């Protein structure tokens, strides 16, 4: 009975979110911005987390905290548009072109016999849901996701991300195997590199000067497959005009320190579009943050920061 009840609630929620996805993007952004600010005003915990993260980065101002709250609301509600809008509508909207070119390059390499695959790393910046969705319109992509605890939200997430060309897989052993298989076929995989991994799946590396437990999965996948690695940001444009996709090849090893340094560079370009209310400095069960001493950090597996070249 409980399973049937969960299924019914999930079905209603999916239909509701699909209905939201039919609304114009400018309207969704306007509503999302208002809801994001309302949540910021009503939730002391949300305000505290946002302010603390901004202060850690040395970027705090009331104006930036307020605008980032609006951006977080837009990111949440625009997912309905990205997930459930017809493919043709997304192709008509600005922002898919860079992903289309990237997918075409991958297909061309496959046709030439180069099956090393592509690892796309998309931090919690702007409309990060749009990257895989746009890529999947041209070529297949397998994306890793962390399953929400609530089964209703889990069903919604899977329904939303299971769109044309996109295969979502859970962040567990089976999901990692699926990523490896996709890369060995010469296909693309998508990962949120600033998502806090479980103990044993990451290393400590500085993020805005503070140790953050950072996943080593991109590094392991790249070492096993020789795949091309790129970092992507999907910037939200004003007034609901669409998105601007920025793709950078990540030369060398995608180790945690390099990843965090490159993500920092991206965030500083448009800090209001980073999800500052995300608990990036969460300490996984069984882990202890390293002492602020370089020798102790190295002994504990904390990688010192790597500062990228000027201009990223």
Q: Where do the protein language model's features map onto the residues?
A:
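Membrane-anchoring hydrophobic helices of lipid-metabolizing enzymes
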Residues: 1-122, 154-158, 163-165
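Non-catalytic C-terminal accessory region of glycerolipid acyltransferases
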Residues: 2, 63-69, 112-114, 137-140, ...
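Short Gly/charged-rich anion-binding patches and loops
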Residues: 15, 49, 130, 156, ...
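Active-site metal-coordination segments of metallo-dependent hydrolases
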Residues: 48-49, 147-151, 211-215
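Short, flexible loop segments at the rims of nucleotide/cofactor-binding pockets, characterized by
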Residues: 89-98, 146, 165-171, 207-209, ...
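Short amphipathic alpha-helical segments and helix-helix/interface helices
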Residues: 103-109, 132-133, 157-158, 179-180, ...
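Catalytic core of membrane glycerolipid acyltransferases/transacylases, capturing the structured
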Residues: 116-173, 199-206, 236
